[in-house]
Regions:
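N-terminal helicase ATP-binding lobe
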Residues: 1-715
Length: 715
């Protein structure tokens, strides 16, 4: 069967109008959304503000300028440590141009900085919690505006005081900014919104937080409903300008603040934030883009020769294959950035002609490029990657690889829009409606987020003075009901929630307390880059040249300066691994894309969970005794088995083949479940939060056949 011809679209550029005025940043003429958030914060207007300006439209400056000029201490939460570092660099460069920038103290806090930089700064502190407490006390005692850049994991630990240190300084922040919020999972969104809502609703004499700012794509219906109905703070879309009786004078004109434009058509008062793009889409399965590209190598090389190009793929093994092949061509300055190759990022960004990458550059890495080549396994990834072509008015090119089902749905749309410059908003609606929805199930809210929140509330009750405990519990219950239960479901009571909470044992609750959950990772020494990190164990076993070692032997292979990092990372990993590069299969089994055969094995508690508990009553449980099997064998795999067997991890096994389960429960290719050796037949297993999501989908099927809601509450 011949390959279908690609479909093409001409996407109009996106321009934002500039509006002059007394803005507190030198050399800046702001956009409407920047004026809007400036006016809200300088007027001290309390609320939840969502800024969904396009990528490259200056969302960071929209909050940074007013909080610094007005002296509003702010905690800004970013999804990745790379983005924290990037923002720290960008904000530092801006401070001299912002009114009040000289009176600002900028802090970047991650687990790495707490273990290294701040451990040296506060040698008397014996834990991360104590270091963070001392750091914030010192910052606030300076009487400067404090800007804390951190990740969601640190923020959640701060708010819940899981560091076991009373870090009261978090209550002194007046503004909370959450970046890239649309990229968070359902569990992550629920956790963040609940904790921020609780902080906002606390008496101002206790907690000063009055402004919640979310930098995000346009919120979908469910998320907008959460903002409007669950949060105590009034909800505003920044572009709506709805909190001002008299809008800013510069914005009272009839001209639109946002326009689409074709090449050469951008009016003088507008700046391009997204260029006109010639978009070509071809079909390729998820994790199959590299194969598709290499099968059409001549065409791909012709495209890459026409301009500076960024390639964004899904799997590191795809990067390995494409990068290795491109390095053997006549292309110059081919670079790669991924989880194993983050050294020298700035130099690579400045010098590449072709950059091969994955989600490592999807957010947090600024680059300029003439064109992009990317895989779009879901709608969010498709538009995030397409949006990396930005802040240019010149016509650009994009080459996308989409799931085959989506490609076939787009063929008639492309024919109907042939030779037209298509409005991006309309195009985005069409694409999003065509993707299969593999989002997490709505029942996760009341099955698990409610449990997590209830446990949090009960801990707050225990810490409260006896006279306040009843009020804390009632307020907490109302917040749980607002956030996680459908108001149309009558008859829910606190006893119902206590019953749900009783089902979850303490080990499961500990898993829920973490922001991102857990996965099966191992501690890796990368001999190529001379770095230590944790990484996904299934990927390493399938696609890497690795060996496993005892801890003592592992340490003998490390440079002295890396040994201190081991104690920081080993609590989050299983085993000790040395990485030498890519796995090179033998000629007999030369399918590099597939890699080694890898599976987990059902033993001990995991076997009992599968064999002794029917699917209709089986729940995720924290198990030990996990084993792995890999063919061809890996040096030291028996050592890994010993380390892995004693670790505790949240598991949910199901009977059936992986692909069967993915199809049956609409998990999509990124609903991570793994094959499981089971003596009674085919089986698969999910870990961490993925285990909870899969359990919800299974129970939703059972709920469809249940006659009463009480049966569902009992799982």
């Amino acid at each position: 069967m011949s390959n279908p011809d690609p479909v093409t679209f001409q996407l109009a550029g996106l321009g934002l109008r500039t509006y002059p005025g007394e803005y507190p940043v030198d050399g800046i003429t702001p956009y409407r959304h920047q004026w809007a958030l400036h006016d809200a914060l300088t007027a001290r207007e309390p609320g939840t503000f969502v800024n969904d300006a396009p990528t490259g439209g200056g969302k960071t400056l929209s909050w940074l300028a007013p909080v610094i000029s007005e002296g509003l201490s702010t905690v800004a939460v970013y999804p990745t440590n790379a983005l924290i570092e990037d923002q720290k660099r960008n904000i530092s460069d801006l401070l001299n141009d912002v009114d009040g920038g000289n009176d600002c103290q900028l802090l970047a806090v991650t687990s790495e900085t707490l273990q290294n930089k701040y451990a040296e700064q506060f040698p008397e502190a014996s834990s991360n919690g104590k270091r963070l407490s001392l750091l914030l006390k010192q910052a606030f005692s300076s009487r400067k505006t404090v800007i804390l850049l951190t990740n969601p994991d640190i923020f959640v630990l701060l708010r819940r005081e899981i560091y076991r240190e009373r870090i009261g300084e978090i209550k002194r922040f007046e503004v909370a900014v959450v970046d890239e919020f649309h990229r968070a999972t359902r569990k992550e969104r629920n956790t963040m919104l609940f904790l921020l809502d609780e902080m906002y609703d606390t008496n101002e004499s206790v907690c000063r937080l009055n402004h919640l700012v979310f930098l995000s794509a346009t919120p979908e219906v469910r998320l907008e409903k959460q903002f409007e109905e669950a949060m105590v703070a009034p909800y505003y879309r920044v572009e709506d300008f709805g909190w001002r009786n008299t809008p800013h004078p510069a914005i009272s004109r009839e001209t639109p603040s946002t326009i689409s434009f074709s090449p050469g058509d951008l009016p003088a008062d507008y700046r391009a934030v997204l260029p006109p793009v010639d978009l070509l889409i071809e079909p390729a399965p998820t994790f199959g883009t590299a194969t598709k590209m290499l099968d059409n190598e001549e065409v791909v090389l012709e495209r890459l020769a026409t301009g500076r190009t960024v390639i964004m793929l899904d799997g590191v093994h795809e990067i390995d294959r494409v990068y290795d092949r491109l390095c053997r061509t006549d292309l110059t300055r081919v670079e790669r950035i991924d989880g194993f190759h983050r050294e020298g990022v700035r130099e690579k960004i400045n010098t590449f002609d072709t950059l091969v990458s994955n989600s490592a550059v999807e957010v947090g890495v600024d680059f300029d490029t003439d064109q992009i080549v990317f895989s779009g396994h879901d709608a969010a990834s498709f538009f995030q990657r397409l949006g990396r072509l930005r802040t240019r008015s010149d016509r650009s090119a994009a080459f996308a690889y989409a799931p085959p089902y989506l490609f076939h749905d787009l063929e008639p749309l492309a024919d109907s829009l042939s030779r037209q410059w298509v409005n991006r908003t309309e195009f985005e609606k069409c694409i999003k409606s065509a993707y299969v929805d593999s989002s997490t199930p709505a029942s996760f809210d009341w099955r698990y987020s409610a449990v997590e929140a209830y446990d949090h509330v009960e801990e707050r009750v225990e810490d409260a003075p006896s006279d306040d405990q009843l009020a804390v519990r009632k307020t907490g219950w109302y917040r749980i009901e607002s956030h996680f239960f459908n108001r149309e479901q009558e008859g829910l009571s606190e006893s119902d929630l206590q019953r749900i909470h009783g089902v979850a044992d303490s080990e499961l609750l500990e898993t829920l307390k973490t922001y991102r959950g857990e996965s099966v990772q191992t501690l890796v020494y990368n001999q190529r880059s001379q770095t230590v990190q944790t990484y996904n164990l299934p990927y390493l076993l399938r696609h890497s040249d690795i060996s496993f070692h005892t801890r003592d032997d592992f340490l003998t292979h490390l440079p002295d300066e890396l040994i201190d990092q081991v104690s920081r990372l080993e609590p989050y990993s299983s085993g000790y691994c040395i990485y030498r590069g890519d796995f090179q299969p033998s000629e007999i089994d030369s399918d590099q894309a597939a890699g080694r055969l890898f599976t987990y094995k059902a033993t001990g508690e995991l076997y009992s969970l599968l064999s002794d508990h029917p699917r209709d009553i089986r729940t995720p449980e924290v198990c030990t005794g996990l084993e792995v099997e890999v063919t061809p064998s890996v040096n030291g795999v028996d050592i890994l088995k010993d380390d892995l067997s004693t670790d505790q991890i949240l598991c949910y096994p199901l009977e059936g083949h992986v692909s069967q389960i993915q199809n049956q429960y609409s998990l999509g290719s990124f609903g991570f479940i793994y094959p499981l050796l089971y003596s009674e037949g085919e089986a698969a297993v999910a870990f961490g939060h993925d285990a909870l999501y899969l359990h919800c989908r299974v129970q939703d099927r059972i709920q469809e056949e249940s006659s009463t809601f009480d049966e569902v509450l009992d799982f």
